[in-house]
Amino acid sequence: MNPRRKQRLTWVAILVIGVSVATGLMLYALSQSIDLFYTPTELVEGKGKDKQKPQVGQRMRVGGMVVEGSVERDRETLEVSFKITDIGPEVTVLYQGILPDLFREGQGIVAQGELIEPTVLKASEVLAKHDEEYMPPELAEQMKGIKHVNPNTVEKGEGQ
């Protein structure tokens, strides 16, 4: 094998190894952050097999049902505080802004923001779940036993 061909082969091998390592690291990083959101139980007790808890200061999404009677609004500002739960612990969500029209106590929401204490999320965005019919099977299993108020029946006077 002549020296020029040997040099080319060496460069091709280095390039293939480099691309493989970069792809592997990228896939590993993506697999660690693929969760759509944490439930309040996962936030408090940890998530996954190793029960890994998120760190204070971490940006995340937390989803659950708004606890009835927990919504507190500041009369002077647009600041709102409320609690969400799934089947266990409650997580406090602090939000500055106008809440979505579908936001109600007993309604499912997803809040995106920064964890400022182990059970307190300062939300930058609050999304109200609008389709109460579909729920992923894992979440449906966790949410069994939680009272859910259907806003359609409350408006008609049937849910009271």
Curated annotation (Swiss-Prot):
Residue numbers on the Cytoplasmic membrane side: 1-8
Record key words, sorted: Cell inner membrane, Cell membrane, Cytochrome c-type biogenesis, Heme, Iron, Membrane, Metal-binding, Signal-anchor, Transmembrane, Transmembrane helix
Gene Ontology annotations of biological process type: cytochrome complex assembly
Membrane topology: Single-pass type II membrane protein
Main location: membrane
Single GO term (MF): metal ion binding
One of the record's GO cellular component terms: plasma membrane
Record field: transmembrane: 9-29
Subcellular location: Cell inner membrane
Protein residues bound to heme: 130, 134
Residue ranges, Periplasmic side: 30-160
Tagged with keyword Protease: no
Xref: PANTHER family: CYTOCHROME C-TYPE BIOGENESIS PROTEIN CCME HOMOLOG, MITOCHONDRIAL
Entry similarity comment: Belongs to the CcmE/CycJ family.
Role of this protein: Heme chaperone required for the biogenesis of c-type cytochromes. Transiently binds heme delivered by CcmC and transfers the heme to apo-cytochromes in a process facilitated by CcmF and CcmH.
NCBIfam families, A to Z: PRK13165.1, PRK13254.1-1, PRK13254.1-3, PRK13254.1-5
Protein name: Cytochrome c-type biogenesis protein CcmE
Organism: Idiomarina loihiensis (strain ATCC BAA-735 / DSM 15497 / L2-TR)
Gene behind this protein: ccmE
